[in-house]
């Protein structure tokens, strides 16, 4: 695992992938924030929003991991 990370960092375009991850993560955070802000009146559903947020975050992390292993 350590060798794969070092090979990844030695590539010339690793910073482009990092910027892509940051941009997608920021967009994802804005999307979740806008959904939560629009439905702020439904406070009784807050725990469901938290569960949806956590599951979306796990899906996002799994997607990032898959993209890393596919392109590496």
From Swiss-Prot:
Primary location group: host cell
Domain of life (superkingdom): Viruses
Keyword list, A-Z: Host membrane, Membrane, Transmembrane, Transmembrane helix
Compartment list: Host membrane
GO cellular component: host cell membrane; membrane
Membrane topology reported for the UniProt record: Multi-pass membrane protein
Transmembrane segments: 15-35, 50-70
Protein name as it appears in the record: Uncharacterized protein ORF15
UniProt source species: Spiroplasma virus SpV1-C74
